[in-house]
Amino acid sequence: MLKMLSFKLLLLAVALGFFEGDAKFGERNEGSGARRRRCLNGNPPKRLKRRDRRMMSQLELLSGGEMLCGGFYPRLSCCLRSDSPGLGRLENKIFSVTNNTECGKLLEEIKCALCSPHSQSLFHSPEREVLERDLVLPLLCKDYCKEFFYTCRGHIPGFLQTTADEFCFYYARKDGGLCFPDFPRKQVRGPASNYLDQMEEYDKVEEISRKHKHNCFCIQEVVSGLRQPVGALHSGDGSQRLFILEKEGYVKILTPEGEIFKEPYLDIHKLVQSGIKGGDERGLLSLAFHPNYKKNGKLYVSYTTNQERWAIGPHDHILRVVEYTVSRKNPHQVDLRTARVFLEVAELHRKHLGGQLLFGPDGFLYIILGDGMITLDDMEEMDGLSDFTGSVLRLDVDTDMCNVPYSIPRSNPHFNSTNQPPEVFAHGLHDPGRCAVDRHPTDININLTILCSDSNGKNRSSARILQIIKGKDYESEPSLLEFKPFSNGPLVGGFVYRGCQSERLYGSYVFGDRNGNFLTLQQSPVTKQWQEKPLCLGTSGSCRGYFSGHILGFGEDELGEVYILSSSKSMTQTHNGKLYKIVDPKRPLMPEECRATVQPAQTLTSECSRLCRNGYCTPTGKCCCSPGWEGDFCRTAKCEPACRHGGVCVRPNKCLCKKGYLGPQCEQVDRNIRRVTRAGILDQIIDMTSYLLDLTSYIV
């Protein structure tokens, strides 16, 4: 009896081993793949029996030899017996292409993804945002995705109006994981055309990913519905407001409570000339708040425009830097009447513009300009303005001079030079993406650390990260370190993390590329060398959010936390831009030691802002009078020539004349007035009172 029981147990073990091996038949080197196999409804796939496979073969013969889904998944499948390949689950107008074309054949193949034993992973992935897409497709292998795009773009009008790279950015697997087709195809396969081609390496990568998963950071979606956000920064006034720049010409305020004000902080969309095509850099470029913004309310904006007075001469548009002042009455809005033009540079092309504005710890304004793709022949026709292209300018905006908007710092390398403009601090840049100032540099020998991304635009391998140093020529300067190109997207410069919540990132320079890849650079305190580190962003487990779209820029709030700005489309009119925040899942979203008191935004209270009504205040508080005004705080109007016969100048070149006189300067006698001798002092008092009332009405 005991021997019989042992024999039955042995048979049971052999049977279990057989079924397990049968289940894994056709799934090459998956190791723990059985745990990952799930159908779209969450159930495990079924092992097809012989009669199911026989029925599939008969259906294949009836269809004229066309391969059905049963032929793709002969062992494990989520479609049983005579279930049709589409199963009614992929009802979409793109699948109406049923004629005998190559596109129709690919669509029939894609329908079979629902029968895949990995269908849940193919359709439900944190990389995707299905709700925002017109196409419901599985994650495609890269080569297969491009094959589908080029084959079907002429047969599916309205759905493939984009480039192959952009289409496959959303519908192709980027991390080398599971993708469709996950069965052998009779074709010459490239390195990423078929999931089975990379299965051997995938398990190794996944095992490494599982080991380091606990070190990943998360991304938290903060705001959506933005239009091409290109920057986010704080004003340093203690209000902890985040100012979000939109390429079309708007600046919006995000409150510490996570709300966006309905009225924009700055609206110059009528002045800004923005590009709507991919690669067109025109638009609102940058914003920088004065270090003493809380008292003087000064901010500096760079944007592209095209004014009539520049119509003569070779140019496509103008890059302009303007100073604005916040409204005296509303701290959440800019007074557009306070605009003062600082700088204008004529541009011939719509790329390599730069335009980043920064204030360094030295209090000077830095303007980073690209080379504008200008050639030597172009420079001869640019009337000298091209001397600034490809340079970092350093200006002192804290000047009391009313006739010029800035002065030149005496420490500029070309302060006394006749060969270079004195504004130039460094030169030789090509296409500076984004630059950032480290607010707490660790090197005691360097009091200013500016890190910039730059590229000459010819190929991805030319991308570099530069540390800007006074007087240096960066024409052929190598990058801080040689890093492997992780995609064909251009680099997007970020920020040196000096926040509190993600303390593991402290001191790291966080940046990425347009295609959504992230990296960090860290400087060794001993060797002073920069070291590259990938930035791991988790997409599951302790992380609830995930990143999607193209990286447009990075941002930093008043607490030093770093943000990511993205958009899924390149059109400025679409509201699909998002703002993400990098957070450490190992720590609370707002640790107690990271909290800071929020100070309500206040209106300007300086003496100049209160009393200077007929002019503008410099950043240092001096009241500069507008034409026609003079005196303390510009209260006295000027009339040239001066008013005569006791007239009073009440407005520029406007005299208030005494009774009996008229003309611009009260020089004429009014002969229409009847001259009646007044015999009493009462009549004189009445005349003087009437004159004073008229004068008071003008002054008020």
Swiss-Prot record:
Keywords attached to this entry: Cell membrane, Cytoplasm, Disulfide bond, EGF-like domain, Glycoprotein, Membrane, Metal-binding, Repeat, Secreted, Signal, Zinc
Binding annotation for Zn(2+): D383
Disulfide pattern: C216-C536, C218-C543, C402-C624, C435-C452, C500-C594, C608-C617, C612-C623, C625-C634, C639-C649, C643-C655, C657-C666
A GO CC annotation given for this chain: ciliary membrane
Cited function: Modulates hedgehog signaling in several cell types including brain and lung through direct interaction with members of the hedgehog family.
Entry similarity comment: Belongs to the HHIP family.
Protein name as it appears in the record: Hedgehog-interacting protein
Organism: Homo sapiens (Human)
Organism taxonomic ancestry: Eukaryota, Metazoa, Chordata, Craniata, Vertebrata
Gene behind this protein: HHIP
